[in-house]
Amino acid sequence: MGYAITLRLDAAAATVVEAMWQALASRGVSDEALQLRYPPHLTLAILADSADPQLLVAAARQCAAQWPKLPSIFASLGLFRGTPSTIFLAPIVTSELLGRHAALVSLLAGEPVDPYYAVGQFVPHVTLASDLADSAAAVAALGLSPLPITSLLDRLDVVRFRPVEVLESHSLANI
């Protein structure tokens, strides 16, 4: 188990991403995202199970109090290569998104943040499927996906996983 702090996609964009998850499942590529039973999201930080959940909740509260909803455009598919690999939806990276990530990570100083989520290492993404043995099948299943996807990142959640348990969820203010 571990923890994550995530920005969730608005309902309209989430519906599009869930259809992409369904396409992957129906083609026999992966149903992992559907099995999570957690809405489409962009993870800002993953932390080890040894993290202090009270500190994570406090950091999320502080950020949520200052952050309005964030307009985002998911323009392309990406792939974290390897065996297994991960296919993801990539946003157009903005200074606002990177600034939010950096602000959150600074509040988590001393906590066991996964190195992939450190400032300067962070690759913003929405995971579509991971643990893929055949990334070509995933790309083929998503070939006709409606890109770009315009979204508002409208909630900030602190979750414990697996299974996913939302510890705290904050609606972000309107722009």
What are the functions of these language-model segments?
Residues 1-71, 95-152, 168-175:
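Basic, often amphipathic N-terminal segments
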Residues 75-84, 119-122, 156-166:
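Short proline/glycine- and acidic-rich turn/helix-capping motifs at secondary-structure junctions
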Residues 84-85, 92-95:
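Charge-rich, low-complexity N-terminal segments
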